[in-house]
Structure formats: C-alpha cells, structure tokens
C-alpha cells in the first residue's frame, strides 16, 4: 500500500511538471525545404531535451498568440546576407530566423541551439544578429584507403567492401558524423580514395573495370544514395 502511494505521488509530480513546462512553437512555411525542416528538427530536439513543450507547425506562419514563445524559420531573398548567412531578430515572444538559403536557416538554428545549450536551457535569443561563414568550403576528409597495399591490387587500389571498410556501411555512425559536421558549420565531406570508380561505376564497354561483386556494388550504390541524401539536407556536399 505504501509503495502504491509513493508511485501515485511520483506519477502526479511528473504529470504536474510536464503541465508546467513552457511551450515553444516552431513555425515553418508550407513550402519549406528539406534543409529548413532539418533545422527545425534539430531545434526541436534541443528544446525537448531542455524541458520545453515544443509545438511544430508547418503551413500557417501567422504569429497569432503573443503568449507563446514562437520561432519562425524562413528562407529570404536578402542580398545583404552572404551565401549560407542568416539573420536572427527577436521582438517580444517572436524570434525570426531568416536564411539567405536553406543552409543559412540551419546555421541560424544552430546559433539558437548553442545559446540554449550554453545557458542551461534558457531561451537567451539575440534581439538582432547577422552572421555568415567566412570560408566558401569548410569540411573534413575521410580516408577510404589503408597504410599497406591490398593483395592482388596496385597502389591506391582499395575497393569499397565491407571486409576492407566495415565502418563505411554503418548508417547510424554516419548520421552522428554528419550532425557533428553541421554543429561545426562544415559544408563539405571529402571521401578520399585513389581509385573509387572501380567500386561505384559500371560501364557496358568495360565490364572488367568493376572490382567488386554485384551484391557489393548494389550495397555501395545504396550507401552513396543514403549518404548524399542525408548530407544534402544538412547543407553538406559529398566530394569523392
């Protein structure tokens, strides 16, 4: 009986705590790009973790409730912003994140995310802020090569196979890595291999050029499709 009372007390406490959470609304336009939606998802995850009740609204971007903290994400044709640049403005309970492009919106969201994380969850948003990356390409290089030559292959010949590069086929790890690149405002991923075409391209006139079996080739196609799609919605170019 005592344990039952303790359980009910704990449940009621959690319920009341949830009811008392501040609500934050994130609004995106009906035609929001994948990058804008990705920025919204990243922001939502951070606010959820910080203890806020997050409402996602795509379509109507009218600021209709001044009592609710609202974040509006939009792409704008603002020539005063550089490529990948953003403008954050806050008036009352409305914070606007305007990006010159989808990447600009992502970086504007990252600015808000950093401020939430650096202030113990407080919504310390700037009244006015414009910023943009200084360098055109900012990225990381991942080597798909080894320190020694493979038996039966020449220099720089390292076919993409699960046996040689098992980590390359780990989608969950790639998601974490791509998110890390975004958090550091990187926009390019360089996959370094001296001769990648033998693992990725089939030519009718040169069937012998393919150095992996059909199953591995299809696996490589699927992985590159996955990797480029996930990278693109984060504003990242995959350069092979």
Where are these regions (language model features)?
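Acidic, contiguous N-terminal accessory segments
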Residues: 6, 19-92, 122-126
């Amino acid at each position: 009986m005592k344990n039952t009372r303790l359980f009910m007390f704990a449940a009621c406490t959690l319920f009341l705590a949830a009811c008392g959470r501040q609500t934050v609304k994130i609004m995106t336009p009906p035609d929001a790009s994948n990058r804008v939606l990705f920025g919204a998802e990243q922001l939502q995850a951070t606010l959820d973790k910080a203890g806020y009740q997050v409402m996602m609204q795509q379509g109507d971007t009218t600021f209709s409730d001044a009592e609710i903290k609202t974040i509006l994400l939009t792409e704008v044709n603002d020539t005063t912003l550089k490529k990948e640049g953003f403008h954050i403005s806050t008036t009352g309970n409305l914070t606007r994140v305007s990006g010159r492009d989808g990447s600009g919106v992502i970086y504007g969201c990252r600015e808000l995310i950093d401020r939430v994380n650096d202030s113990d969850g407080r919504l310390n948003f700037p009244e006015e802020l414009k910023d943009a990356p200084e360098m055109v390409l900012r990225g990381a290089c991942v080597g798909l090569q080894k320190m020694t030559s493979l038996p039966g292959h020449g220099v720089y010949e390292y076919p993409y196979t699960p046996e040689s590069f098992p980590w390359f086929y780990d989608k969950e790890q790639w998601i974490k890595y791509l998110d890390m690149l975004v958090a550091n405002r990187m926009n390019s991923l360089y996959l370094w291999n001296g001769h990648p075409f033998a693992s990725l391209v089939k030519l009718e006139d040169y069937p012998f050029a393919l150095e992996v079996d059909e199953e591995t080739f299809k696996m490589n196609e699927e992985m590159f499709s996955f990797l480029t799609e996930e990278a693109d919605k984060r504003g990242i170019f995959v350069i092979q």
